[in-house]
Amino acid sequence: MLLILKAIILAIVEGLTEFVPVSSTGHLILVSDVINFKGDYANLFNVVIQLGAILAVVVVYWDKLLNSVKDIFAPDRRGLRFWINIVVACIPAVIFGFSLDDYIDKYLFNPITVAIGLVIGGILMIIVENKYRRRSKTKNIYDMKLRQSIFVGMFQCLALWPGMSRSASTIMGGWIAGLSPVVAAEFSFFLAIPVMVGASGLKLVKSGFYMTNIEFIALIVGFVGAFLVSLVVIEKFIKFLQKKPMRIFAIYRIFIGAILLILAIFKIVTI
């Protein structure tokens, strides 16, 4: 039952943090360290709950995704442009992700690097939002230009550092490229589908598939939990972006990251 409890905790953490700019991977690393959830099974579990979160994107945006497929052959080819933008934006992360995956897993998946990523990412969010949020020109995702998707894709590579946040990186890239807050967030959500499915597939292959019955049950609990929490968070986050700045997330990141670094520097705790 302890494993099930850990699964529920981590599923909630994943669902709450995957699509907001605070780094779900960073939070999973920190919480896993606190509840002593480590090893090969833990790595597999984290992959599976991320897939649950991705399924939530598909469900929330099912109509828009379906219409974008139908619109591939529309006279204005807007559906085709949409999918070309998604594919192009994925390329940088695919290249760097596959090339650096082992290095990242070995050297960057620890609380200290997460804390550094949280602080740096938070500072960047404040700077970028203050300068670029109100300069947006593209207010419809179908109007995105190829250069904008390339720029967002390059920024997504920042998220290879745990703690930086894929959501924060892509939204910041979108703002600088001229996307409105909502378009930047939605493009970030859509971009998460192929990128995270690919990354999760790679880790699944490396992890293997053997597990006990209770471990399998915990996987199901985690998957469903992350899916349900993500459903709520996605819709709430879009409504939040329409009215309020993301500064609160940046402040939260800087606060948590700074506390962790102070604790480590003064050796109050070992992280």
Curated annotation (Swiss-Prot):
Its main location: membrane. It catalyses: di-trans,octa-cis-undecaprenyl diphosphate + H2O = di-trans,octa-cis-undecaprenyl phosphate + phosphate + H(+). One of its GO terms (biological process) is response to antibiotic. GO terms for molecular function: undecaprenyl-diphosphatase activity. It comes from the Bacteria. Keywords: Antibiotic resistance, Cell membrane, Cell shape, Cell wall biogenesis/degradation, Hydrolase, Membrane, Peptidoglycan synthesis, Transmembrane, Transmembrane helix. This is Undecaprenyl-diphosphatase.
